[in-house]
């Protein structure tokens, strides 16, 4: 079964609390999503392989560590996932970015895919699927399935806020995909929103209703 990593760093908890506040405006919300995504990227890349390299400093020659040519990819689930991309790119500027477009049916709460664009070398990359909210888990599960159908072998899921129902669905449908969260909340309400959550992340990111 996939592992669930919930980040308890004080900076992440502080920023998540401000993000949750109903009075937090679009500009600040967008900045906070970006900042938390950057902080999460630090932990998401903890297991990257290192190799020894010979370099020369202004003082002497020395052997130091660098990341060993790992191919990475970030795949935001449109549209809210876009808010996490720049923060992660700041930490991993050379990664390729794919996109998966999904919308959730307001009646069934199930996702429908309308767009998919990925790097050509899918099988050679380690992917991180990003979406601020993991509610029912339907969109994330479908996005991961789409990646696998295209040949992806290594996938992680990174979300700001999750409900236990969404985590359970990912673990059941994709037990090989580890889940990285800034917060694991209590439950879903009758409308499919995470409680206490932070509202509709897409609307709050882009100033729409």
Swiss-Prot record:
Pathway(s) the chain acts in: Pyrimidine metabolism; UMP biosynthesis via salvage pathway; UMP from uracil: step 1/1
GO molecular function: GTP binding; magnesium ion binding; uracil phosphoribosyltransferase activity
UniProt entry keywords in alphabetical sequence: Allosteric enzyme, Glycosyltransferase, GTP-binding, Magnesium, Nucleotide-binding, Transferase
GO BP of this protein: UMP salvage; uracil salvage
Superkingdom of source: Bacteria
Activity regulation text: Allosterically activated by GTP.
UniProt enzyme class: transferase
Positions contributing to uracil binding: 194, 199-201
Family, as annotated: Belongs to the UPRTase family.
Full protein name: Uracil phosphoribosyltransferase
């Amino acid at each position: 079964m996939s592992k669930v990593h919930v980040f308890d760093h004080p900076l992440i908890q502080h920023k998540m609390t401000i993000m949750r506040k109903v009075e937090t405006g679009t500009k600040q919300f967008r900045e906070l999503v970006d900042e938390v995504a950057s902080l999460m990227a630090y932990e998401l890349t903890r297991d990257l392989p290192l190799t020894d390299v010979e370099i020369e400093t202004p003082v002497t020659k020395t052997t130091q560590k660098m990341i060993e040519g790992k191919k990475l990819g970030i795949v935001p689930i449109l549209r809210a996932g876009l808010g996490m991309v720049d923060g992660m790119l700041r930490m991993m500027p050379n990664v390729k970015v794919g996109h998966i477009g999904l919308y959730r049916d307001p009646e069934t709460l199930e996702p429908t895919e309308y767009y998919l664009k990925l790097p050509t070398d899918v099988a050679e990359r380690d992917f991180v699927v990003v979406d601020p909210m993991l509610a029912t888990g339907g969109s994330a599960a479908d996005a991961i399935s789409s990646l696998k159908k295209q040949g992806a072998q290594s996938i992680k899921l990174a979300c700001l806020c999750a409900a236990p129902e969404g985590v359970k669905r990912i673990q059941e449908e994709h037990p090989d995909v580890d889940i990285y969260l800034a917060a694991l909340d209590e439950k879903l309400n009758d409308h499919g929103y995470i409680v206490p959550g932070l509202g509709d992340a897409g609307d709050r990111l882009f100033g729409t209703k």
